[in-house]
Curated annotation (Swiss-Prot):
The gene is lolA. CDD domains: LolA (cd16325). This is Outer-membrane lipoprotein carrier protein. Transmembrane segments: none annotated. It comes from Pseudomonas aeruginosa (strain ATCC 15692 / DSM 22644 / CIP 104116 / JCM 14847 / LMG 12228 / 1C / PRS 101 / PAO1). Participates in the translocation of lipoproteins from the inner membrane to the outer membrane. Only forms a complex with a lipoprotein if the residue after the N-terminal Cys is not an aspartate (The Asp acts as a targeting signal to indicate that the lipoprotein should stay in the inner membrane). Important for cell envelope stability and growth. Residues 1-21 form the signal peptide. Keywords: Chaperone, Periplasm, Protein transport, Signal, Transport. Monomer. Disruption phenotype: Essential, it cannot be deleted. LolA depletion affects cell envelope stability, and decreases the ability to cause infection in a G.mellonella model of infection and in a mouse model of pulmonary infection. One of its GO terms (cellular component) is outer membrane-bounded periplasmic space. It is found in: Periplasm. NCBIfam families: lolA (TIGR00547).
Amino acid sequence: MRLIRTLFVAALAMGASLAHADDSAAVQRLTGLLNKAQTLTARFSQLTLDGSGTRLQETAGQLSLKRPGLFRWHTDAPNEQLLISNGEKVWLYDPDLEQVTIQKLDQRLTQTPALLLSGDISKISESFAITYKEGGNVVDFVLKPKTKDTLFDTLRLSFRSGKVNDMQMIDGVGQRTNILFFDVKMNEALDAKQFTFDVPPGVDVIQE
């Protein structure tokens, strides 16, 4: 799924930053920042580059997240897609193809990075080795999966002034999938209906 394989690292002017290699301190710092947002809405821009730096795809859209495990990612036209989870299953709707794919949500953080922002991250240290740097109002984390059966080799997650700012995922062949978040709003009331999907008439349904 294109949207779950997406992330962005902005060039951060960190000034004098301090690197922390203590995994327990990094886990505590990351979970503290993530748990501040029980709900989150934002717009995003998405950029995917191959291993040589060639641009493969650029999109934008909006997202809504709610703990535990609910998310809605809507990519704008011309590559419109809608990805929704109610915490148990996922709908991937492509209006151009008039097709929706429905599958069980993979609860592993290494397989569904969106759950870092919306799921249960109490056992995050079981999935990742984590380090971080902090300077000024910026905190930049690097997450390395502890198993090989993952979508990515490295995931970077950055916060600015306590809000998620950008993410980047790098896979085994060097492809980088990036997301930059902006207009981020936390802990506002969200309608539960936006985390379910009613299949439009005439749309093909694929169950996986």
